[in-house]
């Protein structure tokens, strides 16, 4: 699974400053609570690949970004 990482508390995606390689996005994507394999910055948001199907991605159906 792939998609934009989402903060489950706020419903907002993880933001990043510049499209391309991102140490921050890669680290967050690979964190235990996300479980992804590779993350990078795409359109000012962190995109994550290799996510388990159980990991939610943005947008959340039941929680719009505040």
Swiss-Prot record:
**Secreted in keyword set:** yes
Q: Disulphide bridges in this chain?
A: 12-65, 16-41, 25-46, 29-48
Q: Which GO terms describe its biological process?
A: defense response
What protein name does the entry list?
A: Toxin CsEv4
* Described function: Beta toxins bind voltage-independently at site-4 of sodium channels (Nav) and shift the voltage of activation toward more negative potentials thereby affecting sodium channel activation and promoting spontaneous and repetitive firing.
Family, as annotated: Belongs to the long (4 C-C) scorpion toxin superfamily. Sodium channel inhibitor family. Beta subfamily.
Sample GO molecular function, one term = toxin activity
Q: Which GO terms describe its cellular component?
A: extracellular region
Q: Where does this protein reside within or beyond the cell?
A: Secreted
What keyword terms does UniProt attach to this protein?
Disulfide bond, Ion channel impairing toxin, Neurotoxin, Secreted, Toxin, Voltage-gated sodium channel impairing toxin
- This protein's domain notes: Has the structural arrangement of an alpha-helix connected to antiparallel beta-sheets by disulfide bonds (CS-alpha/beta).
The record's section on SMART domains has:
Knot1
Coiled-coil annotated residue ranges, if any:
none
- Please list the tissues where expression of this protein has been recorded: Expressed by the venom gland.
Output the PROSITE patterns linked to this UniProt entry.
Answer: LCN_CSAB
